[in-house]
Amino acid sequence: MSKPKAPRRVGDKEALSVGTQIRGSAQKLNLVAGLIRGKRAEDAMNILAFSKKAMAVDARKVLASAIANAENNHNLDVDALVVAEASVGKSITMKRFHTRGRGKSTRILKPFSRLRIVVREVEEA
């Protein structure tokens, strides 16, 4: 007897990838995620490859993982994939201190974010 298999978190024609601790604010990552929402997966990879935003590097890695999951784990057609969902949220925040004059210090906040990308296979029209 083994443990029952957990139900899928996405639909049958969908694949998921999550980047959990991406160094940077959720606001900056959401700007990059907005560039690829609803686009074809191949076009989204090109947009991220030529984007000047620093967060595009990490977003491209998560998208590449979602495409690989679709191809290898769920046997979906890579050419028919569309970025169905690209949601961003906050993760941890590292706290650091910066020493200042007269024996004082100030707090530095170093935010991390999460990126969840779902790709869906669509029929060519």
Curated annotation (Swiss-Prot):
Disulfide bond residue pairs: none
Per the record, the domain of life is Bacteria
- MF (Gene Ontology): rRNA binding; structural constituent of ribosome
| Gene Ontology annotations for the cellular component aspect, listed alphabetically | cytosolic large ribosomal subunit
What this chain does, per the record?
Answer: This protein binds specifically to 23S rRNA; its binding is stimulated by other ribosomal proteins, e.g. L4, L17, and L20. It is important during the early stages of 50S assembly. It makes multiple contacts with different domains of the 23S rRNA in the assembled 50S subunit and ribosome. The globular domain of the protein is located near the polypeptide exit tunnel on the outside of the subunit, while an extended beta-hairpin is found that lines the wall of the exit tunnel in the center of the 70S ribosome.
**CDD domains assigned:** Ribosomal_L22
Q: What protein family does this chain belong to? A: Belongs to the universal ribosomal protein uL22 family.
Under the subunit heading, UniProt states: Part of the 50S ribosomal subunit.
Organism of origin is: Novosphingobium aromaticivorans (strain ATCC 700278 / DSM 12444 / CCUG 56034 / CIP 105152 / NBRC 16084 / F199)
> Which positions carry the signal peptide feature in this UniProt record?
none
Arranged from A to Z, the UniProt key words for this protein are:
Ribonucleoprotein, Ribosomal protein, RNA-binding, rRNA-binding
* Gene name linked to the record: rplV
- In its UniProt record, which GO terms are filed under biological process? translation
Classification via InterPro entries: Ribosomal_uL22, Ribosomal_uL22_bac/chlpt-type, Ribosomal_uL22_bac/org-type, Ribosomal_uL22_sf
For whether the record's keyword set contains Protease, the answer is: no
- State the SUPFAM superfamilies in the record: Ribosomal protein L22
Please identify the protein, giving its name as recorded.
Large ribosomal subunit protein uL22
